[in-house]
């Protein structure tokens, strides 16, 4: 199947060492909430990009109808519910650190009895004393393990709740964007990275996680470069990339050229239109789809 969405980079992504970032393609995002006006959808692009090619609206409309599956959100919810039921993964299990249990043969053997002048009663008394001490230490170890198990479980549950909420916001944002083949690109990205990486991106970049995963899924070489970095360097690159990704309305170009002159006529409506357009551009740059659409409706009302 020929992809209908791409992401475009206008500069090399700076990487640590000798890593040179690959330039990205352009990404087109369809506005599926307005099937009658596919030309008025959105594109996710990197700032300063001016060369994003237009896509076939009919194909975009077809892909836009695909439902985002919220896979990672469901996985996180299922993991949290399993832990609440007591079904703990190995990573959460805490085993008691038990001391070695006394061996009666060490007391009643020829060598052991020699320590007690071959007196069986003395040897048995020594064994019973050692075993009683072991039972007390074992009980303490088990109590400590239970306490640590409870602490780890509570910590996991609290952290899981944060990840589930981050995943919910992530998919809510993805659905608002209505990226035609979003699920395909997210799946491609998730196959490249450990599950924890995707969850961390959702948590650390709540406003741009959907765009980041789409971009990296469409450009797997960038995802591989990030995986090759240490954690701090990868976080810096992800932050830089998130700042460059932006929305732009379909059919328009984001330009670094100075803004057009303000209307110099006495037409108040013309000035209002210009102000609303600027607000629309600002909302698009922030990825605020809801505000953009409200302003767009307001602009139509002035016309």
UniProtKB/Swiss-Prot annotation:
Report residue spans for region: Interaction with the capsid protein: 275-303
The record's induction entry says: The scaffolding protein negatively regulates its own synthesis when it is not assembled into proheads.
Q: Where is this region: Post-transcriptional autoregulatory domain?
A: 1-74
Question: What are the entry keywords?
Answer: Late protein
This protein's assembly is summarised as:
Homodimer. Homotetramer. Interacts with the portal protein; this interaction initiates procapsid assembly, thereby ensuring incorporation of only one portal ring per capsid. Interacts (via C-terminus) with the capsid protein; this interaction allow to form the procapsid, in which the scaffolding protein forms an internal shell in the icosahedrally arranged capsid protein subunits.
Q: What function does this protein fulfil? A: Required for procapsid assembly. The interior of the prohead is filled with the scaffolding protein. The scaffolding protein is lost from the structure during packaging. Scaffolding protein exit is followed by the expansion of the procapsid into a mature capsid.
Quote the protein name from its UniProt record.
Scaffolding protein
Organism in which the protein naturally occurs: Salmonella phage P22
């Amino acid at each position: 199947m020929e992809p209908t969405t791409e992401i475009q980079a206008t500069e090399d992504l700076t990487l640590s060492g000798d890593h040179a970032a690959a330039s990205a393609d352009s990404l087109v995002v369809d506005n599926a909430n307005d099937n009658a006006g596919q030309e008025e959808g959105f594109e996710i692009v990197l700032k300063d990009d001016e060369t994003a090619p237009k896509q076939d609206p009919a194909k975009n409309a077809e892909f836009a109808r695909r439902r985002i599956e919220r896979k990672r959100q469901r996985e996180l919810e299922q993991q949290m519910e399993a832990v609440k039921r007591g079904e703990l993964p190995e990573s959460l299990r805490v085993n008691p650190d038990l001391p070695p249990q006394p061996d009666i043969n060490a007391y009643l053997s020829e060598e052991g009895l020699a320590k007690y002048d071959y007196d069986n009663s003395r040897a048995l008394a020594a064994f019973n004393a050692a075993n009683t001490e072991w039972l007390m230490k074992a009980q303490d170890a088990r109590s400590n393990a239970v306490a640590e198990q409870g602490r780890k479980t509570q910590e996991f549950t609290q952290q899981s709740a944060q990840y589930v909420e981050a995943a919910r916001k992530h998919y809510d944002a993805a659905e608002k964007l209505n990226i035609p083949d979003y699920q395909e690109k997210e799946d491609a990205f998730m196959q490249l990275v450990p599950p924890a990486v995707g969850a961390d991106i959702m948590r650390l970049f709540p406003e741009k996680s959907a765009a980041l995963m789409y971009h990296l899924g469409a450009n797997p070489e960038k995802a591989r470069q990030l995986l090759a970095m240490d954690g701090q360097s990868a976080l810096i690159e992800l932050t830089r990339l998130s700042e460059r990704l932006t929305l732009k309305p379909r059919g328009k170009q984001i330009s670094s050229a100075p803004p057009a002159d303000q209307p110099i006529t006495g037409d108040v409506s013309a000035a209002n239109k210009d102000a609303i357009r600027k607000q629309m551009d600002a909302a698009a740059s922030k990825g605020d789809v809801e505000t953009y659409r409200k302003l767009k409706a307001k602009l139509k009302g002035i016309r």
